[in-house]
């Protein structure tokens, strides 16, 4: 996939000189692994050879794991990361859309968080603003939730759509949210599965290549990546998250993509609900023009940046105002209803979900068999509700999966009954857990109580999770 701004291929003699010797002939995989293990530079030919080995089965699982660990420990420079991204993108099918759509084709991606249901709200809101959003999303793995699993908690919703079906949905609705097929970026699928079991997830070049290779095949003009940092994020440190953000922007430019990266805090859950069905309910509240302020704020900010960068708004503020209007006037909710119907949900159910009250919606979606409330152990101001321990307990209860393909319980989750910054009296309920199995164990209760952090300072308004926006060097 030749893209504007991509560095020219290295000549064989240059590649050999930069990479620690050798000629233009393909190196064997053990030699490539040794080179990167020792901190060497992989040439374009080296990287493409490795990706070809993934695809034709020459690379053994042990060799894949060894190469990933070498990259994790030694890193990759901009050129190596760009070539890896491009090689992964070229390993499968490219999606093609009408040329007249190019400026409208946009997307958003998140590095993963707890309670992160932004995509469910943002995709239809952008469609209501005239965008085309061919969102290829993922499933939950570990403590982070997956957009596909949330949508599949809605009876009938199908995340499997052919390119032809995606084209039709984009024409009629303006957005679709689908899963990654075996034909789209298959080499990334191999690396993604291996990274999860080899402790190589938290690598800037590997994350960059994985995200951007999937987005490159979507044929986008503009992408905003929500890079999480904090206690429940891949990178707890904001500076490391900023490093990833800058790499995403620079590699995206080489692919001809207009990429910006938002740094957003992930210490507390986003919104008040965590768990697949509960997050769908909260997304519908936001699409009603209501919902928790932190969720609405993030949707509006990310959407405003996308409209501005794609040339569909003159400023970020103007773009944000358009997204807010789509939430408030019902047009985003209508697009969500159309998307549900287009992706397999019975039109009557889609209509009932989008027009019903919160109580009615809960009856239409899968829900857990019982609920337990936790009481505050002391008086104080809610300083923080740690997202990671909360997510880990919900994972144990069946809301998450430890391996790909493992079934989940869509109704399992938790509702926060308090907001960060508010006063909480001893004995007051602060968390409602929805569960299917036995009652919470004493250890699970201790873990959840440890997630609640109280202080003695004055009540305060919780800050927005949005920290900063990393932009390409030249912006509209």
UniProtKB/Swiss-Prot annotation:
Pathway(s) served: Pyrimidine metabolism; dTMP biosynthesis via salvage pathway; dTMP from thymine: step 1/2
Keyword terms: Glycosyltransferase, Phosphoprotein, Transferase
Molecular function per GO: 1,4-alpha-oligoglucan phosphorylase activity; protein homodimerization activity; thymidine phosphorylase activity
Matches recorded under Pfam families: Glycos_trans_3N, Glycos_transf_3, PYNP_C
GO cellular component terms, A-Z: cytosol
InterPro entries xref list: Glycosyl_Trfase_fam3, Glycosyl_Trfase_fam3_N_dom, Glycosyl_Trfase_fam3_N_dom_sf, Nuc_phospho_transferase, PYNP-like_C_sf, PYNP_C, Pyrmidine_PPas_bac/euk, Thymidine/pyrmidine_PPase
GO biological process annotation, one example: mitochondrial genome maintenance
Enzyme Commission designation: 2.4.2.4
Biased composition (Pro residues): 1-11
Catalytic activity: thymidine + phosphate = 2-deoxy-alpha-D-ribose 1-phosphate + thymine
Modified residue annotations for Phosphothreonine: 6, 475
Region (Disordered): 1-26
Cysteine-cysteine disulfides: none
Subunit composition and interactions: Homodimer.
Family: Belongs to the thymidine/pyrimidine-nucleoside phosphorylase family.
Its biological purpose: Catalyzes the reversible phosphorolysis of thymidine. The produced molecules are then utilized as carbon and energy sources or in the rescue of pyrimidine bases for nucleotide synthesis.
The name this protein goes by in its record: Thymidine phosphorylase
Species the sequence originates in: Rattus norvegicus
